[in-house]
Every structure is written in C-alpha cells, then in structure tokens.
C-alpha cells in the first residue's frame, strides 16, 4: 500500500510540535463541556464549539461542520514511524502498525458520547486524578471506548502508590537482611584460625584455645618446644606443640584479665559488691555515722581482732540476758533505828556497805560478757577506775521509786536532811537525787540500766590521764569492740520498744549524757571520801582503802586538792599486786550466792 507523504519541512515542524507537547507538564485544565446528564453519559451540543483536552496535551476547537475537514487532514503518529496522509489511510496504517496503541487526532462529525471507563484505566494521567478514555478506531457514527487494557507499565495513582510502597518495603527488607548477614560475620580464632566461639581473654578465640589458655595460666605451664620455638599453630597442628601455642596466645593479645565488662560473671560482681560494701562500712565508721540497719559488726571486721571473743558473737537478746543474770544481789546495812545519826555513825554505815558491795562488784564484773577475756592487768585497771561510778548508778537506780530519798539498802533510806549531818555530803546528795529524778522522768528500764552499768565499767579506764603513774590498758581494741556491742544492744532495746529512729537517737544521747554526770559525782565523792580519811573521821576497810589509793594513782596529781607524793616503783608494784590479789580473793563463785537479784 502506498501513502502520500508531506514535505520534509512540514513533517519536521509537526514532529517538534508533538515532542514539545509530550514534554509539557500534565497540568491541563479539565475537559470543558456542558453537563446535560449525569457523569457517564455526556452529550456535546453540535451548535457550540467545544474545547477538548486530549491526552497528549493538544487542545482543539471543533464543531460538527469542521469535523470532516479535520479528519481528512489529521496526521497520524505511529510506533514505526511518522506518516502524513488522508484520514482513512492514516487510520488504517495506524491501526495495522500500532496494534493496541491509541490513535491520535482522529475526529468524527458525529456527536461524542463518553461511556463509563473500563476497569483498565488510561495510561495518560490527568493532573487532578480524572480518568480520560483513549480512542483507537475511527468509526463513522461515534467514538467507542476500547476495552483492551493499557500496557502493563501504566498504572493509576493508587496502584502506583501501592506498588511503590511494596517495592520500598521489599528493598528495605533486602537491605536489612544484608545488614544482618554482615553483622553475623563469621569470626575466626586469633590463635589457630578455627571458628571462634566468642570473645575470650581479650581476643576472639575458639573453645579449644580458650580452655588451653585457662589451664596454662591456672596450673603447670612450663612447656618446652622440641623444635626451634617456631612451630606452626593452626586448626590441624595446634596440639602438636604446647609451648608455641601458649606463645602465640600471648602474641595475639590473650591475657588473664582480658574479660569484657559486659560479660562479667556473677561471682566477680558478687566479690565487687562485697568489696564496695566493706569500704562503705569503713568510711561510715570513720565519719562517725550511726549504724542503721545492721547493728552488729561485720564478720570480716571481727575476724581481724586480737581475740575472737564469744561475747562478740552474742545477739542483742543474749547480751541482755547475760547482763541481767550477772546482776549482784541486794545487801542489807547494819543500821540500828534506835541510834541517832552522827557524822561518824553515818560514814561508818556507808563505808561498811560500800566495802561489801565491792566484793559482789568484782564477781559481777567477771560475769560481764567480754570482761573475762581481758588480761588481769586490764581487769584491775577498769575496776579501780569505775568502782565508785558503779556504786552510784546502782544507788540512783534503786532510788527511782523513792522521790527525794536515796535507798542505800533495803533497810537504809535517807533523805536530804539526814545527809546534812556529814560535812560536805549535801552537795553529793543533791546530785544523786537529781540523777534519780532524771531516770524516773525518762522511765529507765532494767535492761537499759544493766547496759549503762556495763558501759561505765568498760569505758572508765580507756582514756587514761597523761599524768597517771600507772600504765594504760593493753587490750583497748577488744574493749572498744565489746563497748560497741553493748551500745548496739542498747539501741536494739529502744527499737524493740517501738521508738522511731529519731527518738532512738535522742534517747541514746540523753542516757550517755547522764553517764557524764555520774562521772562528775564519782569524782566529788572520791574527794569527799579522801578528806574523811585524812581527818580520821572513819576507818576505811581493806578493800575500800585499796580502791581509794589506786584511784589516786590513776587520777591527775592536782585533783585531790593536795599534791600527793610521787609513788615509788615499789609502791606501784605493791598496789598493783595487792589489787590483783584482792580481785581473786574477793571473787565469789555464782553458785555460792544466795541473795536475791536487784532487777
């Protein structure tokens, strides 16, 4: 079949026009036509020219009269080439050569009727998402919508979005899989080049080299190379030479402490926590903070003491029970109500009562937990420093139920007026009554009393005066441990009574402050007793006299009012041996006591 072609110049001009139209953005105005019916069946009035926005972007004005002329001269765009000729021939050529591709610019004089678009949409996308049908055949009566679907590479807006999403998802999955595969990169042993099982001793290594290095650093490792210390260590020959294998372990960086911080075992973390707890407790004790939850010393601390005393292993309740059992019995005085009081008679009654109480005090001290673990020198030293304080706190405790009076014995109850018969006794009486009133106001319990009494015994000689002529304590550390134990027992009693932490702190401070007043009263009483001795008002008994002389040796030289003569070494040795002999002589076995307890 032959076709008539146009000139070359006109063909090139039309080609440029078509290329320009294809490159224009698809933002053409919508198809302008009068709406005579609902969408889907739209009729064009033949009397009015109408503007069509064709898919390729070219706008044409036509009416029914000009349709035939336009159809006769419409150019045809084909896939195999560009040809220009009459409309009928061009339509036949275009249909035969393009197949399913749409025919452009073929116009019919008959009215245009748009039908519902098929499910397959146009490959040409409208800017506003409208679906525009495309036309293939030149029919004399009307334009028909081709039912054949568009090519596979053309899709609607929604289909494109779904397809793009699926493509992005699949590409991201492929990238993620590639990253995971690269993360799971196979690692090899730095020693023998076998597959590594993990990070061991600072390097990536297999199980065999890890176990070999562990055995080598923990046990016998004096290996000898049978060759020149240059053996090849690989997967197959790693067991041939232990010396070269160990050498290579060190060369690649294996070390005993080479453990990753995030792979520390439970045992190592447990040891680290124990170390931190011990350091924290030491810092806490150094700063003087009060113990909170755990009142007892740590076993790690007790282990380093000079003596592992059984008293340090007692619980709070066991300590209280032991102190209550050790309490001495009540002692009756030789008071005769038929005889009036005088200075000599009252001092004789009081000194005789004190001398007998000293005997029971020695027996009580030996039963205090921790006191019997001390050597004889320290036991004598503590008793010589605290004997009058112990007698006074016992007197104050017995007098709590008798306001304004002092109960020296069950048959000897004295008030302030009766104490005036002894020179200088009223001041000491007033201090004793004030302390008894303080105990009564605080509602002191018997368990707290025995703890305070033991604290007085153990704390009296710890801080020896620099001017003292006797040597100080030899086992101060052990004494401090026992003191801490008794103090913790006192706190336990307060917590057991239901006191809050703040109330416990306040009550403990108040009780310890009372001990300082008792120390002051003891010093006043010692001065008064020494003055009575110097005036020969009353004879002193042997044990009481020894205690008084020993106290003068422990006290500063200026305390007694008159400067004492410096004792000789013979006097010091005699006093020390006499006191020690007195402690052993006046010791009463517990089974020999037949008197009721004071508590």
Curated annotation (Swiss-Prot):
Task: Give the region (Mediates interaction with DNTTIP2) as residue ranges.
Answer: 189-314
In the record, the effect of residue 371 to A is given as:
Abolishes estrogen-dependent NF-kappa B transcriptional repression, impairs transcriptional activity, abolishes estrogen-induced interaction with NCOA1
Please indicate if the UniProt record lists Ubl conjugation as a keyword: yes
**Zinc finger motifs (NR C4-type), residue ranges:** 189-209, 225-249
Q: Which residues carry this modification: Phosphotyrosine?
A: 541
State how changing residue 515 to A affects the protein, per the record. Reduces DNA-binding, attenuates transcriptional activity, does not effect estrogen-dependent NF-kappa B transcriptional repression
Give all residue intervals belonging to the NR LBD domain. 315-551
Consequence of changing residue 525 to R = Abolishes estrogen binding; impairs repression of NF-kappa activity
Q: What is the effect of changing residue 508 to A?
A: Reduces DNA-binding, attenuates transcriptional activity, does not effect estrogen-dependent NF-kappa B transcriptional repression
Chief localization class? nucleus
Hinge: where is this region? 255-314
Q: What is the effect of changing residue 549 to N?
A: Abolishes estrogen-dependent NF-kappa B transcriptional repression, impairs transcriptional activity, impairs estrogen-induced interaction with NCOA1
Residues covered by region (Interaction with AKAP13): 266-599
- Enumerate the residue ranges of region (Required for interaction with NCOA1): 35-47
Q: Which PANTHER family match?
A: KNIRPS-RELATED PROTEIN-RELATED
Q: What is this protein called?
A: Estrogen receptor
- Show the taxonomic lineage: Eukaryota, Metazoa, Chordata, Craniata, Vertebrata
**The encoding gene:** Esr1
């Amino acid at each position: 079949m032959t076709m008539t072609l146009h000139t070359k110049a006109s063909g090139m001009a039309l080609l440029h026009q078509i290329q320009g139209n294809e490159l224009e953005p698809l933002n053409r105005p919508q198809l302008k036509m009068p709406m005579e019916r609902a969408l889907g069946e739209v009729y064009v009035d033949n009397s009015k020219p109408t503007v069509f926005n064709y898919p390729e972007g070219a706008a044409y004005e036509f009416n029914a009269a000009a349709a035939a002329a336009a159809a006769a001269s419409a150019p045809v765009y084909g896939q195999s080439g560009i040809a220009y000729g009459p409309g009928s021939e061009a339509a036949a050529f275009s249909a035969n050569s393009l197949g399913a591709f749409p025919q452009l610019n073929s116009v019919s004089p008959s009215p245009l009727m748009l039908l519902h678009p098929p499910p397959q949409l146009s490959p040409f996308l409208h800017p506003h998402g409208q679906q525009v049908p495309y036309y293939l055949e030149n029919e004399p009566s009307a334009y028909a919508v081709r039912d054949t679907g568009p090519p596979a590479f053309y899709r609607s807006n929604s289909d494109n979005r779904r397809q793009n999403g699926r493509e992005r998802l699949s590409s991201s999955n492929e990238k993620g899989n590639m990253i995971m595969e690269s993360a799971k990169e196979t690692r090899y042993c730095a020693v023998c080049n076998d597959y590594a099982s993990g990070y061991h001793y600072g390097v990536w290594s297999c199980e065999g080299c890890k176990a070999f290095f562990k055995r080598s650093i923990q046990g016998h490792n004096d290996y000898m190379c049978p060759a020149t210390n240059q053996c090849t260590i690989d997967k197959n020959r790693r067991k041939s030479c232990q010396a070269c294998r160990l050498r290579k372990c060190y060369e690649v960086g294996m070390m005993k402490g080479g453990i990753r911080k995030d792979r520390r075992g439970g045992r190592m973390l447990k040891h680290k926590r124990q170390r931190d707890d011990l350091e924290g407790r030491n810092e806490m004790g150094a700063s003087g903070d009060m113990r909170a939850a755990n009142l007892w010393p740590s076993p790690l601390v007790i282990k380093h003491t000079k003596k592992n005393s059984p008293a340090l292993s007692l619980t709070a309740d066991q300590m209280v029970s032991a102190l209550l059992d050790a309490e001495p019995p009540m002692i009756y005085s030789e008071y005769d109500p038929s005889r009036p009081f005088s200075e000599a008679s009252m001092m004789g009654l009081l000194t005789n009562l004190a001398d007998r109480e000293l005997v029971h005090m020695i027996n009580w001290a030996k039963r205090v937990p921790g006191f019997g673990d001390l050597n004889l020198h320290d036991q004598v030293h503590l008793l010589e420093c605290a004997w009058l304080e112990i007698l006074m706190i016992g007197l104050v405790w017995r007098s709590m139920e008798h306001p304004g009076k002092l109960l020296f014995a069950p048959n000897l109850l004295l008030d302030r007026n009766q104490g005036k018969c002894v020179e200088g006794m009223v001041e000491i009486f007033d201090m004793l009554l004030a302390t008894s009133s303080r105990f009564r106001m605080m509602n002191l319990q018997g368990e707290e009393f025995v703890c305070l009494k033991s604290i007085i015994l153990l704390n009296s000689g710890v801080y020896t005066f620099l001017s003292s002529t006797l040597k100080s304590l030899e086992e101060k550390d052990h004494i401090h441990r026992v003191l801490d134990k008794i103090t913790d027992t006192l706190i336990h009693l307060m917590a057991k009574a239901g006191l809050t932490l703040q109330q416990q702190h306040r009550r403990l401070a108040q009780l310890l402050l009372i001990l300082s007043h008792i120390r002051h009263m003891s010093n006043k009483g010692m001065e008064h007793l020494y003055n009575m001795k110097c005036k020969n008002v009353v004879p002193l008994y042997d044990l009481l006299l020894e205690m008084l002389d020993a106290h003068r040796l422990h006290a500063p030289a200026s305390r007694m009012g008159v400067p004492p003569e410096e004792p000789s070494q013979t006097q010091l040795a005699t006093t020390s041996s006499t006191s020690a002999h007195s402690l052993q002589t006046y010791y009463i076995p517990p089974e020999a006591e037949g008197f009721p307890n004071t508590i």
